[in-house]
């Protein structure tokens, strides 16, 4: 009796003998095909370009500032001024007990007189301290970014030097851009990039302190990236926001103008809820915090005062607002149980078993 696999081997024997040769040939063909195809470096180049662009472009979001550059409310503001440098330390994936302990350590630092309650004055002092941390962080980042756009290291950056680096981050050849600028030739850029360049140039000129020389020092470059560090640049940022929101051209803002929905239509109930929250939150912010004289109109001066992160009066108002959110027993102070219960407001993460954990951490 011949086993089936023996019979099969005898029938396919000649072909089986060719198998190693065929495999070798197939491998050679695949290798040639792989080597003939150009390597895909586009994603790598894109990541590098994005990193370079992020290093030299003014950020849309400024930690510790109430409004974004586009006039939207800073949704993370309360967490930023409560956590400071610990902003990234309360991830959803973090171990809950460790997060609760960390939150109670912060509570103890805010509670200067150790009476296990946080007053508005204590919270005000803490907000100012955390805002200063964000300022220091921005200064350190700006120093690094300044070196990236100051290739000759002379301590000054011209608009043309910055323009070369910016367009290089957009994928243009640095040498070709530099040559075109030197020869006063027209640069071919798309409409969107041209618009960004024009806005950046306006901002560059504003950051150039008198006497204007169109060269930015390291300090002026900091103001260019972070307008909250300069009174003049903060005023310029406010002017830009008012210009974007002001619908009747009177250079001030009414409630309807400030709460106007962003461009876009509501397509579903979730979108409607988001838009309803947008209106409610902005109306409350306008009436309770920005419109200081409560006349229904916000001037550029009122908006500038509201956005100034180092304004102690604003810090006190924010402290009172933050306490009011969690002050369940209405004693105008924050207690450990309240901070833990409203941990999502203070840290962005919801910490469970807050009442029991008070005894654990203390």
Swiss-Prot record:
GO terms for molecular function: calcium ion binding; identical protein binding. Residues 1-36 form the signal peptide. The keyword Magnesium does not apply. GO terms for biological process: calcium-ion regulated exocytosis; cerebellum development; fat cell differentiation; maintenance of synapse structure; response to ethanol; UV protection; zymogen granule exocytosis. Ubiquitous. Isoform 5 is expressed in pancreas. Keywords: Calcium, Cell membrane, Cell projection, Cytoplasm, Exocytosis, Glycoprotein, Golgi apparatus, Membrane, Metal-binding, Phosphoprotein, Repeat, Signal. InterPro entries: CAB45_EFh, EF-hand-dom_pair, EF_Hand_1_Ca_BS, EF_hand_dom. The keyword Glycoprotein applies. CDD domains: EFh_CREC_cab45. Ca(2+) 1 binds at residues 111, 113, 115, 117, 122. The modification Phosphoserine is found at residue 99. Ca(2+) 3 binds at residues 213, 220. Glycans are attached at residue 40. May regulate calcium-dependent activities in the endoplasmic reticulum lumen or post-ER compartment. Isoform 5 interacts with STXBP1; the interaction is enhanced in presence of calcium. Isoform 5 interacts with STX3. This is 45 kDa calcium-binding protein. It comes from Homo sapiens (Human). The lineage of its organism: Eukaryota, Metazoa, Chordata, Craniata, Vertebrata. The gene is SDF4.
């Amino acid at each position: 009796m011949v086993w089936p696999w023996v019979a099969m081997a005898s029938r396919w024997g000649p072909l089986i003998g060719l198998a190693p040769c065929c495999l070798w040939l197939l491998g050679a063909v695949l290798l040639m095909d792989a080597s003939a195809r150009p390597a895909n470096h586009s994603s790598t180049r894109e990541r590098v370009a994005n990193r370079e662009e992020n290093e030299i472009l003014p950020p849309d979001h400024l930690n510790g500032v109430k409004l974004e550059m586009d006039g939207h409310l800073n949704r993370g503001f309360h967490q930023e001024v409560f956590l400071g440098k610990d902003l990234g330390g309360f991830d959803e994936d973090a171990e809950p007990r460790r997060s609760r302990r960390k939150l109670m350590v912060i509570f103890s630092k805010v509670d200067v007189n150790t009476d296990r309650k946080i007053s508005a004055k204590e919270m005000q002092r803490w907000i100012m301290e955390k805002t200063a941390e964000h300022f220091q962080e921005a200064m350190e980042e700006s120093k690094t970014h300044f070196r990236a756009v100051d290739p000759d290291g002379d301590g000054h950056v011209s608009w043309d030097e910055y323009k070369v680096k910016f367009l290089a981050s957009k994928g243009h050849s640095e040498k070709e851009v530099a040559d075109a600028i030197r020869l006063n030739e027209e640069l071919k850029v798309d409409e969107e990039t041209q618009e960004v360049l024009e806005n950046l140039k306006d901002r560059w000129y504003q950051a150039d302190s008198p006497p204007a020389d169109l060269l930015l020092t390291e300090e002026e470059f900091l103001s260019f990236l972070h307008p909250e560090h300069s009174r003049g640049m903060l005023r310029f940022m406010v002017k830009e926001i008012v210009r974007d929101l002001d619908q009747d051209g009177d250079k001030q803002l009414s409630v309807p103008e400030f709460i106007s929905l962003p461009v876009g239509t509501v397509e579903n109930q979730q979108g409607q809820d988001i838009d309803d929250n947008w209106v409610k939150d902005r109306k409350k912010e306008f009436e309770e915090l920005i419109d200081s004289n409560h006349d229904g109109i916000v001037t550029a001066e009122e908006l500038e005062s509201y956005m100034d992160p180092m304004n102690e009066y604003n810090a006190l108002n924010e402290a009172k607002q933050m306490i009011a959110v969690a002050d369940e027993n209405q004693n105008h102070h924050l207690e450990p149980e309240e901070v833990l219960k409203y941990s999502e407001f203070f840290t962005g993460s919801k910490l469970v078993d807050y009442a029991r954990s008070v005894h654990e951490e203390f």
